[in-house]
A protein has these predicted regions:
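Canonical positions in the second alpha-helix
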Residues: 9-10, 43-44, 78
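Residue at a conserved register position within TPR or TPR-like alpha-solenoid repeats
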Residues: 28, 62, 95-98, 102
Length: 102
């Protein structure tokens, strides 16, 4: 069974499994299926808005899809989330990416 199928099996049993949803989004991104990846990140972040790795990777995926304005918005939201949760490492990574995007 491939990773996408395995992750979908997990999500069938528990649709709010944060790690499986994140993994599925990352697998789609790795395969270049950015639309499906972003759809999975959207589901993930609706259920877990303060999941900063999801914010950061969604922003990177948006940037890869040349959706720079959306990536900046995601980073701004992710930075606020990182501040709320005290995740200084994620905050600094997202601030650096935001500065890089201009």
């Amino acid at each position: 069974m491939d990773r996408i199928a395995a992750l979908n099996d997990i999500l069938t049993q528990n649709p709010n499994d944060t790690f499986a949803r994140y993994g599925l989004a990352m697998e789609y991104s790795k395969q270049g299926d950015l639309d499906r990846s972003l759809a999975e990140f959207s589901i993930l972040l609706k259920a877990n808005p303060d999941y900063t790795p999801g914010c950061f990777m969604a922003a990177q995926t948006l940037a890869r899809a040349d959706r720079i304005a959306d990536a900046k918005t995601m980073l701004t939201d992710g930075i606020a989330s990182a501040r709320r949760t005290g995740n200084l490492h994620a905050q600094s990574e997202m601030e650096a990416m935001l500065a890089e995007l201009g």
